[in-house]
């Protein structure tokens, strides 16, 4: 089958937003207007097309990024619907990694909200061009220009309206296009009948003012346009659109649109903007990777003629076809039935069938081309972030960074008979979601699961029950603490046992220094002259890794430490890998005496929104929970407080806030960084873990 849409007519976009901004409804409307669905499903009725997991339909939130393909004005638009809840950050991150552009949906009453900030920051890190859709213009309190101001104040974004609303709340009836300088008036409930007419007289001054501001803002990113603007020459609509497109693709400018997806207004114009201003695969730089054989950097251009290269960005288990691997093809063509190389794992894989996904229905296709997104069946060893390439032109693409889990709980099956079933179910869920970890406590034999938050683990335990038919008892949530060293030190690990039979001998000197936050454990071999033979060096590193997994203070994993092996000795007969592993672990224990070991705890960025009269209560809550206020902002009669608070102190906060504000206060929290635990709290943790408390 020949290529249906050229690369220039392909768009890979994500829809991202804060939870409840109306993102899934917006995606639904896109599917409706592009002819993919015939009846609109409402999120609050639990019938949405993109939210296809049972829990998503019950909770009215999007958990997994469903990928779907639609068509608009002769273009193919691949859409990934991403979750807005902070516990599902990895879903947002991995979709951003494979997108070319995104639509950020705002609730026009609230403007930029905490999760909007998180996904905006991630999109900026990945260099993803964005347009902004101020949704819910029909809602009480909707304020388009306030929403635009929050883009400037909270995100420092160079964002400017290319549209203005006509009316607001119940009176929202149309949109002014600041490029064409025309009004689009909606005349029916489905938003399919639109009248284009002159701008109503009462809006003409405002429209002229904002068109002038738009031209000025765009001209600042474009020298030719700036010259014309300064010389007072007329700027044509085509010139303005071309300049907006260039600036948007270069992530220098963010066009802002408005509408109400629920009331079917503004979605078609937003689709036009996706085509007009967001990039095709040809507009973005060729993807870079490393050739595993030479270690050299290579690029793969968006072209069907280039060798095949793709990134696996999501694994899902489908009840009918089994394991699906979602891939973004960057270059070349992939045929069903062909073999590819998983360069991340160094394994050859066979592509069984290729499916084009539409929410939860699918169409089988023979091949997938550069710039497209599809799901492959038959890949056994491929996991999230793996590169798949032509066997003759191998390259490893940049992977997807996975954040560390911050919360954990103990799970056990309700019946002993379910033990094996639970293990298999948890393993399958962990394959789909890299931020979900499953471990067995070596001392107690208990199964411990870790993730990004309480909702994240709730949903996974729920899926265990629904999809794998395992009823589980769940323990209370626990914080995922870490340990580290705060001072540099040198330590010797000496292990010798020579009583009867073969002896054991290992002797190492290791220098330990604190590493930068987030860099993890780094091992350096600085042995000169073979005082520790080369074959025992890996055993020293492994010995350190194994003992660091259980910490030196309270049994928590150790992070961000550099270890340099610089001296030691060995015995011709008695030295072994085991002896050097033990010697390394003894060196770590010895180092702990002088390296100022400390426990680290996850700090959450908490955003609390409360009525003005409850501000004092909230400040008290933050202080009582060992938190510190980072900033405050007034919005009408409500106050928004941003604070850093340890996760350990946030359990049960929802109840406290609810009773203090009679249910009118809300809060959101997102993991921000790890920080040293105060000494007094540290002592309590150590006591508790040693069984004294």
Curated annotation (Swiss-Prot):
It comes from the Bacteria. One of its GO terms (cellular component) is cytoplasm. Pfam families: EFG_C, EFG_III, EFG_IV, GTP_EFTU, GTP_EFTU_D2. The keyword GTP-binding applies. Residues 8-282 form the tr-type G domain. GO terms for biological process: ribosome disassembly. Belongs to the TRAFAC class translation factor GTPase superfamily. Classic translation factor GTPase family. EF-G/EF-2 subfamily. HAMAP family: EF_G_EF_2_B. This is Elongation factor G.
């Amino acid at each position: 089958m020949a290529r249906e849409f050229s690369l220039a007519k392909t768009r890979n976009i994500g829809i991202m937003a804060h939870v409840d901004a109306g993102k899934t409804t917006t995606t639904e409307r896109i599917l409706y207007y592009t002819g993919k669905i015939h009846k609109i499903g409402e999120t609050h009725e639990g019938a949405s097309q993109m939210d296809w997991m049972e829990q998503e339909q019950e909770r009215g939130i999007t958990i997994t990024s469903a990928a779907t393909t639609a068509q608009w004005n002769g273009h193919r638009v691949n859409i990934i619907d991403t979750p807005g809840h902070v516990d599902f950050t990895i879903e947002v991150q991995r979709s951003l990694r494979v997108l070319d552009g995104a639509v950020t949906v705002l609730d026009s009453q609230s403007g930029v909200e905490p999760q909007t900030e998180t996904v905006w920051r991630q999109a900026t890190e990945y260099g993803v061009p964005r347009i902004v859709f101020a949704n819910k213009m029909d809602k009480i309190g909707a304020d388009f220009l306030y929403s635009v101001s929050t883009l400037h104040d909270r995100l420092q974004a160079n964002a400017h309206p290319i549209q203005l609303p006509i009316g607001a709340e119940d009176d929202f009836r149309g949109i002014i296009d600041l490029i064409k300088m025309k009004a689009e008036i909606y005349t029916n409930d489905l938003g399919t009948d639109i009248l284009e007419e002159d701008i109503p007289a009462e809006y003409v001054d405002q429209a002229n003012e904002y068109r002038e501001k738009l031209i000025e803002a765009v001209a600042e990113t474009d020298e030719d346009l700036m010259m014309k603007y300064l010389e007072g020459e007329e700027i044509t609509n085509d010139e303005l659109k071309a300049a907006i497109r260039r600036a948007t693709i270069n992530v220098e400018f963010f066009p802002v649109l408005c509408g109400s997806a629920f009331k079917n207004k503004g979605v078609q114009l937003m689709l036009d903007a996706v085509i007009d201003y967001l990039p095709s695969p040809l507009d973005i730089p060729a993807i870079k990777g490393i050739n595993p054989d030479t270690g050299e950097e290579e690029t793969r251009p968006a072209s069907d003629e280039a060798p095949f290269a793709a990134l696996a960005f999501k694994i899902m288990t489908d009840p009918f076809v089994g394991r699906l691997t979602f891939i973004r093809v960057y270059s070349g063509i992939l045929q069903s039935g062909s073999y590819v190389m998983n360069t991340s794992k160094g394994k050859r894989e066979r592509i069984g069938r290729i499916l084009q996904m539409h929410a939860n229905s699918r169409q089988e296709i023979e091949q997938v081309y550069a710039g497209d997104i599809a799901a492959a069946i038959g890949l056994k060893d491929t996991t999230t972030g793996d590169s798949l390439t032509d066997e003759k032109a191998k390259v490893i693409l940049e992977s997807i960074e996975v954040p560390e889990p911050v919360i954990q709980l103990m799970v056990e099956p309700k019946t002993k008979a379910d033990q094996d079933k639970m293990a298999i179910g948890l393993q399958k869920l962990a394959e789909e979601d890299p931020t979900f970890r499953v471990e067995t406590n070596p001392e107690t034999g208990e199964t411990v699961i870790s993730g990004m938050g309480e909702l994240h683990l709730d949903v996974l335990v729920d899926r265990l029950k629904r999809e794998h038919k395992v009823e589980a008892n769940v323990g209370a949530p626990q914080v995922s603490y870490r340990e580290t060293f705060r001072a540099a030190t040198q330590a010797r690990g000496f292990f010798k046992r020579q009583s009867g039979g073969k002896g054991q001998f290992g002797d190492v000197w290791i220098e330990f220094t604190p590493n930068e936050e987030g860099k993890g454990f780094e091992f350096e071999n600085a042995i000169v002259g073979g005082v520790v033979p080369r074959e025992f060096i890996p055993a020293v590193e492994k010995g350190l890794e194994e003992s660091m997994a259980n910490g030196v203070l309270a049994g928590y994993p150790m992070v961000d430490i550099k270890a340099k092996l610089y001296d030691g000795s060995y015995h011709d007969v008695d030295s072994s890998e085991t002896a050097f592993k033990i010697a390394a672990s003894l060196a770590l224990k010895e180092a702990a005496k002088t390296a100022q070991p400390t426990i680290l705890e996850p700090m959450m960025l908490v955003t609390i929104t409360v009525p003005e009269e409850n501000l004092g209560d909230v400040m008290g809550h933050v202080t009582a929970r060992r938190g510190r206020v980072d900033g405050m902002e007034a919005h009408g009669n409500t106050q928004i407080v941003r604070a850093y608070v340890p996760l350990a102190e946030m359990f049960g906060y929802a109840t406290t806030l609810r009773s203090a504000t009679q249910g009118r206060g809300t809060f959101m929290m997102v993991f921000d960084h790890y920080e040293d635990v105060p000494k007094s709290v540290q002592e309590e943790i150590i006591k508790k873990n040693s069984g004294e408390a």
